[in-house]
Amino acid sequence: MKFVVASYGTRGDIEPCAAVGLELQRRGHDVCLAVPPNLIGFVETAGLSAVAYGSRDSQEQLDEQFLHNAWKLQNPIKLLREAMAPVTEGWAELSAMLTPVAAGADLLLTGQIYQEVVANVAEHHGIPLAALHFYPVRANGEIAFPARLPAPLVRSTITAIDWLYWRMTKGVEDAQRRELGLPKASTPAPRRMAVRGSLEIQAYDALCFPGLAAEWGGRRPFVGALTMESATDADDEVASWIAADTPPIYFGFGSMPIGSLADRVAMISAACAELGERALICSGPSDATGIPQFDHVKVVRVVSHAAVFPTCRAVVHHGGAGTTAAGLRAGIPTLILWVTSDQPIWAAQIKQLKVGRGRRFSSATKESLIADLRTILAPDYVTRAREIASRMTKPAASVTATADLLEDAARRAR
């Protein structure tokens, strides 16, 4: 069978789709990933076929959005409109690039960003659609915003957000549908996807949101987080450094723009020195040139979370779904310093599970970091983290279950 996977975003958005694509390809299927041009090399190096999905570098796009908006005090309506501008501007281009690629596919799989674009292309071709969700995006009563609210209010809030997003993108979506020969949409995409019977795979563990599986009643299968568990060039060097002394605390912020890396390294170094801890810092896309050097701190660009996390005392990160799952699977406490998107939701869930704490990244200081680390390194957090790890879905099982679901959905539509 032919599977086309459309995924927009940065590395953390693409890797789950690539992990599933590799398993489908291993089973003998024809798989093609449509990804931002800056991530084509990442996908091809993994062994998959890739085509451009959009013309912009998605990391540069993220950096520009943060540089323009993140630290400003603005009218919230103006801020919302500015945040939506990159979404609406890229809509037509993504549709035009994906439509010919998806022709003849047995199933079209979308990542979490631009699902509406992909849903319309699938409807145009008359092929089944499946979606990967990295946190609960459909109406439910279990997530926090970031405070925990009554379940009916949470459900109505999510429904209202869906409606508002639809209204703000209706112009570009109607134009896309007209170009594809489809009528104007009269309801938000989540409702249309449900009517079409689209498969919505929850690529996280149900235990992370107690009560959610019961609320949804099996309509949206949970498979656990999807990862390729790829090795990196730094893994052996990092393993030797870790083995030479006490286990470190890991610090990494994914693709998030975090301002001056030198300032962050200095703050982390000072906090860990006071606690008598070592720090392993992943710089990610940040420029590590000229950062200060400390005996108890090691800075690398990227490491394998699967290989390194189990050898650390705790993890401190931005709260991306994949990094959060890696920390939970490793069985060590977590501190989430969140920046945007679903990250405060994961911070709230880490707190609810009693395996860590969270706060806004911009509010973190040396003093708050010391206090938070002291809290999560306490024996009760360590014990609870190990207990949760024993209940997490194994990465291989997550990928297998997802591929099974996609094959079944494609076969049923034939």
UniProtKB/Swiss-Prot annotation:
One of its GO terms (biological process) is carbohydrate metabolic process. Its EC number is 2.4.-.-. The keyword Iron does not apply. GO terms for molecular function: hexosyltransferase activity; UDP-glycosyltransferase activity. SUPFAM superfamilies: UDP-Glycosyltransferase/glycogen phosphorylase. Pfam families: EryCIII-like_C, Glyco_transf_28. Gene3D superfamilies: Glycogen Phosphorylase B (3.40.50.2000). Keywords: Glycosyltransferase, Transferase. PANTHER family: STEROL 3-BETA-GLUCOSYLTRANSFERASE (PTHR48050), STEROL 3-BETA-GLUCOSYLTRANSFERASE UGT80A2 (PTHR48050:SF13). Belongs to the glycosyltransferase 28 family. This is Uncharacterized glycosyltransferase MT1575.
